[in-house]
Structure formats: C-alpha cells, structure tokens
Amino acid sequence: EVKLEESGGGLVQPGGSMKLSCVASGFTFSNYWMNWVRQSPEKGLEWVAEIRLKSHNYATHYAESVKGRFTISRDDSKSSVYLQMNNLRAEDTGIYYCTTGFAYWGQGTLVTV
C-alpha cells in the first residue's frame, strides 16, 4: 500500500518560517520525482515545487510565487521529502500535499499564516 504522510504544518506569523516533511512508503521512493502542491479557497490547487532524482542531480523547480523563499529537498535513505518555507505570507496559507508525479498523494497538512 502506498502511503505519503505529511507533517509540520500549523500556525505561523507573517515573515516566519516552517518546515514540512513527508515520509513515503509502499513504493521505491528514489525512483520518483516528488512535488509539493497546495490548495486554498482563493487559488484552488497550486503546484509549489518539484525535486527530481539523484540521476538528475536532484534538480529543483519552483512556482514563481515561492521562488527564493521555499526550498525543496529530499533524503532517499529516509524516503522523505521536505519543504523549507521562509518569509511566509498570508497568501501561503493552505493545505500542503506531497505527491509523486501526481499519481500518489498524501492527506495534506494545513499551514496558516
């Protein structure tokens, strides 16, 4: 059974920082690109960041709205992906999900700024 379990959400002041984590199981994590996606009533579903494989030198890509503020990383030995979020803004409020190539999704973690 595939599982993606996010954690680390909560309430943070504008300008603050927060780190989200996602632990995967049930598939070969190191073979999958990983993404963070967020959902809010105002913007709907919004892709945030992507990290590719070791063979791609763990290349990363970001939505323009978070570039320079958010950092995605992964630890294949722990089947985990992370999202470090700095200088948070009210518009960053939403439910954050980790996903593979959008085939598998976690249950989400709520971030409120």
From Swiss-Prot:
One GO CC annotation: extracellular region
Top-level taxon of the source organism: Eukaryota
Statement: the UniProt record of this protein carries the keyword Protein transport: no
Residues in Ig-like domain copies: 1-113
Keyword Disulfide bond attached: yes
Keywords annotated in UniProt: Adaptive immunity, Disulfide bond, Immunity, Immunoglobulin
Matches recorded under InterPro entries: Ig-like_dom (IPR007110), Ig-like_dom_sf (IPR036179), Ig-like_fold (IPR013783), Ig_sub (IPR003599), Ig_V-set (IPR013106), IgHV (IPR050199)
Disulfide pattern: C22-C98
GO biological process, one term: immunoglobulin mediated immune response
Any one GO molecular-function label of the UniProt entry: antigen binding
Note in the entry: This chain was isolated from a myeloma protein that binds inulin.
UniProt protein name: Ig heavy chain V-III region A4
